């Protein structure tokens, strides 16, 4: 009898979940709450004066909310840890992160919408010409703690010394650190490398090749299968319609492409 009761309850829960609409699944409070890395131009940018978010992720959130027929709230996070915590605490419904196996132990990664390329940033007169030149004895590589690039260089570089920063230093400090030789290389995404190169005049140089290609994905709390299914369908439609490509182009992003949709 006990087993029959348990079975009956499981069936009821399954039926309830199946009956939920996409808006109830993705925005259970009635508002779609989305959290992203506000300091990562590949995801989006936040206007310091107005607080308005623009870029691929804000475009995706607004379109998803429009389709669901609900209001939205876009939350800017300083780092991946804040995003993961928000999903665990249910203070956000969906998040956006670059895929990493360590992060996938804390949250479930859904459909990828972008592929992000990553390029090392060096002093303009540096002897380092390509990514393969970096992992050498005596080379000092800087990266920001917990970011995709730091996770990669800390685990893959064998000879170079990795120096981890808590946050991304401002442009003037990046120029000073590279110019003085305190660090030889910054490991950041290609868009940031190119932005820093442009802002420096002729002081800095982004390497032309990519040391890492990473998918930018929707991310949800562990076990939220219904959310992942709804997101997969949504992203597939936007990928095929050209919506994501238009969003990337509108943001004038370099070193970013539409994800292929291949299963991970």
Residue positions per predicted region:
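Bacterial N-terminal signal peptides
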Residues: 6-15
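Ligand-binding clefts/hinges and TM-proximal coupling segments of bilobed small-molecule sensing domains
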Residues: 21, 148-168, 205-207, 236-264
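Ligand-binding cleft/hinge of the Venus flytrap
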Residues: 44-49, 61-71, 110, 149-168, ...
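Flexible hinge/capping segments at coil-to-helix
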Residues: 122-141
